[in-house]
Amino acid sequence: PFVFRGIRDYTSNDSLKNVNWKATARTGNLCVNEYNESVSRNVCILLNLEDDGMLTYDSVNEEAISLAASVAEEFIRQGINVSLISNACDVDTKEAVGIREGAGVGHLGSINTVLARMDLKLEKEEFAELINRTFIENVSVQSSDNSVYVVISASRRKKLQQTMQKFEKKYGQVIWIVPYMTGGEYSLDYCGIRPEGWEVK
């Protein structure tokens, strides 16, 4: 069994599944838990901007987009391939945005352009359905031990949690970051994924 040894700064040889998000948020630097030596070279950002059926705060969605950009920038800086899938739509094409995996400054620019062109007023596909269609029910998509999936979603609907539980069983290495307003909560009661709260002040 692996033993937890502490927290230190991230290096390009670390596995992304060992990122300590709370320490990263606190210090401003990407930090990892020391205990696992496997290496992940691909990260897929799954950005959900659907309403939760409750009060919707523009600041939470804006923070989620900003967080996606920051996550992409940090991983690309470390030489890791990054892809992005979202249910938000492009302002002109009116279609859900996405970008295939890639690395380098040019790829980061493409990701930032895609994020900047999102029109949050356009109707969005339910994220659970998007994940089902794109991954779980798509036999051509193979699971990879070399990938980490970073979910950024303030919505914590029961159906979405149950879908992500199936996703984790098939693909593994899922990190769920929940942007939430100060005084709110970010628990995931319908799946076994441990949430990382991201407070929006």
What are these language model-derived features?
Residues 1-8:
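Intrinsically disordered, low-complexity linkers and stems that provide flexible hinges
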Residues 9-201:
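Exposed, interaction-prone extracellular/peripheral surfaces
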